[in-house]
Amino acid sequence: MSAACGCDEPTTSPADEADEAERPWWRDPGLVVPILSGVAFGTGLALEWSGLHIAALVAFWAGLLLGAYTFVPGAIRNLVVKRKLGIALLMTISAVGAVILGYVEEAAALAFLYSIAEALEDKAMDRARGGLRALLKLVPETATVLRDGTSASVPAREIAVGDVLLVRPGERVATDGLVRSGRSSLDTSAITGESIPVEVAPGEAVSAGAINSAGVLEVEATAAGTDNSLTTIVELVEQAQAEKGDRARIADRIARPLVPGVMVLAVLVGVLGSLLGDPETWITRALVVLVAASPCALAIAVPVTVVSAIGAATKFGVVIKSGAAFERLGGIRHLAVDKTGTLTRNRPEVTAIVAAHGFDDAQVLAWAAAVEQHSTHPLAAAIAAAGRGTPAAQDVAEEAGHGIGGLVDGRRVAVGSPRWIDAGPLKARVEDLEAEGQTCVLVTVDGFLAGAIGVRDELRPEVPEVVRTLRDQGVEVSMLTGDNSRTAAALAKLAGIGDVYAELRPEDKARIVAGFSETSPTAMIGDGINDAPALAGATVGIAMGATGSDAAIESADVAFTGHDLGLIPQALRHARRGGRIINQNIVLSLAIITVLLPLAITGVLGLAAVVLVHEVAEVVVIANGLRAARARKQ
C-alpha cells in the first residue's frame, strides 16, 4: 500500500496472511466493524425517516464511532509517532469538523464509507496475494522420514539436509532432494506451469511441492524444510511486491505531496471563503475539499495491480522479482536468447569421440567426464553422463566461456572449446562435426591434445512458433552463443532467427546486450554462469530457473520455474496488459480528483456525496487492478 494512505502497514507473513484469508468474514474484525458501522448508519437513516430523531442521532453516533475506530487511531499514531500526513488524517479532520458543525449524519456517512472502502482494499490485496498463498500450500504439513530403518511422520519444517524422505504415490515432496531409490513420474504443473509429468530415477533431482504420481520414492533432502525452492520463490515474490516500478513511484510522488497540499487548500478555502461569505458554509466546503482531493484511489492504483499481476505470474511458472522489473518487462522490444540449454532441449548427448594419436576413445571420454562432472554447463552434463567408471578429479576450476580443468590421477586435464584449445591435427574433423550441427570440445592431458568430443543438443520443438509469436508482438529476436558459428547458424536457421552472434565470451555477450539496451528495451534469457553478466546488463534479465545456475538466477530480474519458452510471449502479454491497467487506474484516479475538487469548492456536492463518489471510485480502481490477476498459461 502506498505510504500516502497514512494507514498502518501490514506486517504479517504470507503464512499469516494465508490463515487470515481462510477465516470466514464474520470472524474478521477488519470487515465486521465497517459492516456494523454501515448497519448503524442505515438504521439511523430509517429512524430519521420515521421521525425518531433522538434515536436516529444515537444510531448515527454508533456508526460514526465504529467506522472511525478502523482508521482514526492509526491516523493519529502515524502523525504523532511517524510524523506522517496520510489520507486517514484528512478523513479524521473532516469527520471531526463535521461533528463540530453539527453534521453528525454526514460524519457517520464518511466514517462508514471510508472504513468499508479500506476493508475492501485490504481484501483486494489479500486476493491479489492468492498466488503466493497457493505456493505455500504446495508443501505438505508433514513428511515421512526414514531413520534407523524405521519411518516416522515429522513436521515438514523440521526436515534437515541429509534426511531421507519416503514419498508414496499421491503425496507431495516436502523439500528439494535427490532420488535415492525408486522410479516415478512427478506432476510439477503447480510449480512450473508445465502439464507433462517429469520422469525421475535414482540420482535425479526433485523439487518441493511436486506430486508423486506413480512409484514409491526415497528422496535424500538437499534443502531444509524451511529453505527450499518454493520458499525461495515466495521470498522473491514478497520482495517483488514491496519494490516499486516507475509508475508506482510516479503515483507516490503525486500522492505524498498531495496530502499536505490538500490540507493547505482546505485552510485557504475555509479562511478566504469566511472572509468573503458565510463562515459556516465555507468551513463546511473546506471539509468537503479535504475529502474530494484526497488521493485514496491513486494510492492503491498501482500496488493492487502489481501485486495481482506478479502473484498471477507465479501460477504459470514466471517469478518476477520486483515491481520495477514487471513494468520494464511490458516495454521489451528486443529479446537476446542464449542457445545452449535455452533454445535447445537441454538434453545433450555425446554423438562423436575422436581420439588423437596415442590415445583411445574411452580414455578421452573418461578424462573429460572426470572434470566436467563439476561444471554447471548443460553440455558438461552430457559428457559426465556418457563417461562410465569416471575417476575422481581434484583442484577443479571452471573459466566461464573457455572451459574447465583439474587433476585426474595426477595428470592435468583440460576440457574446452576450440577457441581455447588448438585443435591441431584434429581441426578438419572438428569442422566437419560442427558443420553437422554438433558442438565440439577438445581434451588435453598434461598439455597434449588427447581428442575431441562432439555433443548435440536438439532444438526445443516450441522455438519456431515462439519466435514467430514474438515477431507478431513486435519483438526482435537475436541468438547469442559461445558455440562456433557453423553450429550456431545451423540451429538458428531451424529456429527462424536471422540475427546470430556466435563464438562469444561472457564479456562479449554482456557488451552486445548492453548495446541492444541502448537502442531499445532488451530482455536477455539464459541459464548458465556465462550468461550472468549479460542478464545483469539487460533491461530485463530472464533466467531459466529450474536448471539454471545460482549465478544466473541471482543476476536475473525474472525466473522461469520451468523450461517452456512459450512463457516468454505469455509473460510479455501479461506485463503489457498489467501496464495498461496501471495507466488506466492512474488516469481514473486523477480524473476523480479533478472533477470533484471544483464541485466541492462551489458547494455543488456535499460531504456525504463526495465521500460516496470518492469511495466508489476507489472500489472501481481496485476492481480494475484485480483484473491483472486473470492470467492463464497459453
Predicted feature residues:
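Small-residue-enriched core segments of transmembrane alpha-helices in multipass membrane transport
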Residues: 61-64, 115, 257, 283-301, ...
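Conserved ATP-binding TGD loop and adjacent catalytic N/P-domain core of P-type ATPases
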Residues: 410, 439-584, 622
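Bilayer-spanning, highly hydrophobic alpha-helical transmembrane segments
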Residues: 38-39, 249-277, 285-294, 303, ...
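Conserved cytosolic catalytic loops of P-type ATPases
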Residues: 134-227, 324-368, 407-408, 519
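Actuator/coupling domain of P-type ATPases
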Residues: 3, 10-25, 44-45, 60-142, ...
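Membrane-embedded alpha-helical bundles of multi-pass transporters
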Residues: 46-47, 74-80, 93-101, 312, ...
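P-type ATPase nucleotide-binding
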Residues: 349-476, 485, 494-513
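Conserved catalytic phosphorylation-site environment of P-type ATPases
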Residues: 81, 92, 127-132, 141, ...
